[in-house]
Amino acid sequence: MKAWVLKRLGGPLELVDLPEPEAEEGEAVLRVEAVGLNFADHLMRLGAYLTRLHPPFIPGMEVVGVVEGRRYAALVPQGGLAERVGVPKGALLPLPEGLSPEEAKALAQSLPPP
């Protein structure tokens, strides 16, 4: 799968090929359709966010995508800027039909942290 990876704090994102994630216990793999990026993602890229991640990592916390034919929004600690991401099943918010992925990503920002 393709993913945008940050290899060093403050550096550019690089588009790379990675193995597809496998669902761990209690998780589902979400096929990402849209990602909300905001100031928290920028701070994470600089290493200045409350939760400090160590490179390399895939940014993107607010995601919208599909699991088994159903569209969901979710807030994940990282990994949204990839074609697929593992999400705890309890973090998946089912979305109503007719809501576009771009509209739905705004909902992910209001979800409780994982």
What spans do the regions from the language model cover?
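Extracytoplasmic/periplasmic beta-strand context in beta-sandwich domains
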Residues: 16, 83-84, 103
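Extracellular beta-rich ligand/substrate-recognition surface
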Residues: 6-12
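A glycine-rich, Thr/Ser-enriched phosphate-binding loop motif common to dinucleotide/cofactor-binding enzymes
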Residues: 99-114
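Extreme N-terminal starter segment of soluble prokaryotic enzymes
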Residues: 1-2
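Residues that act as N-cap/strand-start positions at coil-to-secondary-structure junctions
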Residues: 12-15, 79
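Glycine-centered loop/turn positions within well-structured domains
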Residues: 11, 40, 93, 112
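Glycine-rich beta-strand-centered segment in the early N-terminal region that forms part
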Residues: 19-37, 44, 48-79, 86, ...
